[in-house]
């Protein structure tokens, strides 16, 4: 099987499958990736997963400067998910290149670097620092959807600012994926804006803004106050975001992320329009999960006679067009 999962043996009755996927011009062995922020800078997973066998590893978001992040506590479990307010802690790109990247490259993983900034100038500086990276670093995910403006807003909530941030990051000399938020009134217009500014793909979605309170102390559970909700609770939100953007912009590659914990979730996002899928919060509970999902996904494809995973991308839209149910206006 082309691009097969490590340790995967094709069961009897399961068809030969090509797992190779593509996000724009970048090809991957398979569509299974680890999302930014759940495995540090990547090598932390090396003892649990054959990282060279995954589609890609997305590193924790980096800036052009060292950043200490938010006060503790930074994580809090909630029903069907987790709240976090880590605050983009990181060593800065120069230290990461010197201290973390060599070990990550040694695992054989394809690497996607996530960057952030508090201003357009800082996005541009971060991108320029990545221009000389080796070919194993295949793309740059421009994180526009954390509260990283000085006023704690998001670049991704403004079509104009999001487009400007993509435009100023061209110096990275790699395809740029714009990571967007579902916490907007018109996601399609923002996706259109970043595409027109040069984004090769969009990553949908980031965490959903939320707040958890301690009912005894009457204070927020997180040191920063509000935070981002992740995990199973946001999966349907991610599917809807991918669905809407693919329906409006079928030529724009999408990387789906949000509440992925099984091969079922991967298939669902791909049917909605994603070309690749990232696994996030679920890795905290089960660091071996990316490998498990990859094997289960390969088996599912074989049993459903999916010869190439490209067949899955947006396939539910064809069925929906026939039934004319999904995609109708929400009931009032």
Feature locations, PLM:
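Glycine/Thr-rich beta-alpha phosphate-binding loop at enzyme active sites
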Residues: 82, 144-160, 190-252, 288
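Conserved, mostly hydrophobic/aromatic
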Residues: 34, 57, 96, 113, ...
